[in-house]
Amino acid sequence: MDHSMSKKLHDEALLHIVGGVNSPSRSNKGVGGGIPVTMERASGAYFYDVDGNKYIDYLAAFGPIITGHAHPHITEAITKAAQNGVLYGTPTKHEITFAKMLKEAIPSLEKVRFTNSGTEAVMTTIRVARAYTGRDKIIKFAGCYHGHFDLVLVEAGSGPSTLGIPDSAGVTKSTAEEVITVPFNDLDSFKEALAIWGDQVAAVLVEPIVGNFGMVAPEDGFLEAVNELAHVNGSLVIYDEVITAFRFMYGGAQNYLGVIPDLTAMGKIIGGGLPIGAYGGRIDIMEKVAPLGPAYQAGTHAGNPASILSGIACLEVLQEEGLYERFEKYGSMLKDGIEKAAAKHNIAVTVNQIVGALTVYFTEDPVTNYAEAGATNGELFGRFFKGMLEEGINLAPSKYEAWFITSAHSEADILETIQAVDTVFGKMVQDN
């Protein structure tokens, strides 16, 4: 494929934008470098770049675009918002409609508050949990991404008995020491952390199904035990459903798994492609939020009509009968096709697939936590990513990220993708 215009634009972007991108995940650093493709437009399941190339898209903007690009119903809602004014700074009736829709879909959301992003939503749930419990520390799980605010840019110390250390320049040591990080799916480490730090722990922050070192499901009984142990300890449980809400069913991963948190943070899908976040939970906890309580949260753009109307339209699309069954069918088809192609070419892969989301790891071993995901072959994934791009398949540029199937993907798209996988695996073997 010709990418000369993408290269030209990236060179220009480097002169004006830090690193040439507005989010580091777009830089292709995770796949060994190379020029990121600059897209011109998107429609349905497809991207079209500035050089005129067409791609089947599984990036889905890192998750939000579950209905495909430029879905007519969502586009109509956004157009209506633009015509009537996109920002008021006052209440609107649409906020009420959307809050009711979220509450009906995810019953643990007894009260809801809108924010501008998933990062803001997670950040505020932690503040509210601290206000409710009177405690300061949180427990999180290694490798789970919860946004880019200081408190969650923390990596594990040497074990559950040690406090966290900064995972980014600019995060203070004192902030990192408010966080205890333990491995996902490791109940013994979680118990150890609670035994040592329990009386200081305000909340346990959990991705109920991990989406940020690939799609990794909780082992049987893990989330139930986390809930029980946290509550015995007087700590709250926060589910970060920024990736998972409405991903696997019309509702949250908590509905899908049957395990209920005290607070939930959301983003991505619920905006229909526009920036949004939301959080909610038990009434007695949510009443700690201003103006009813002492935990302050505000935002000029929070609940803006454009994002709210886009979100309402997105959820209306997701109520289509049989949609999630189709996600499951196509997800299973992709997993099966990738595994067969890998076996044909004697390439070791593990595919973690949950409904319409999957991750392809270059390893023969199961992946159930961040350490196992980190041990997979990133060099092979980088070659695979670049090969798939040349075959017209757009993936996330990181071995840790998921593929997302949208309502716009067809069976023909899935079959074409499987053929591309077979072709790329064949070339990878030849190159060796």
Swiss-Prot record:
Cofactor names: pyridoxal 5'-phosphate
Coiled coil residues, start to end: none
Location of this chain's protein in the cell: Cytoplasm
Reaction catalyzed: (S)-4-amino-5-oxopentanoate = 5-aminolevulinate
CDD domains for the chain: OAT_like
EC number: 5.4.3.8
PTM-bearing positions, type N6-(pyridoxal phosphate)lysine: K268
GO annotation (BP), single: protoporphyrinogen IX biosynthetic process
Gene Ontology CC terms, in alphabetical order: cytoplasm
Family: Belongs to the class-III pyridoxal-phosphate-dependent aminotransferase family. HemL subfamily.
Subunit structure as annotated in this protein's UniProt entry: Homodimer.
Name the record gives this protein: Glutamate-1-semialdehyde 2,1-aminomutase 2
Gene of this entry: hemL2
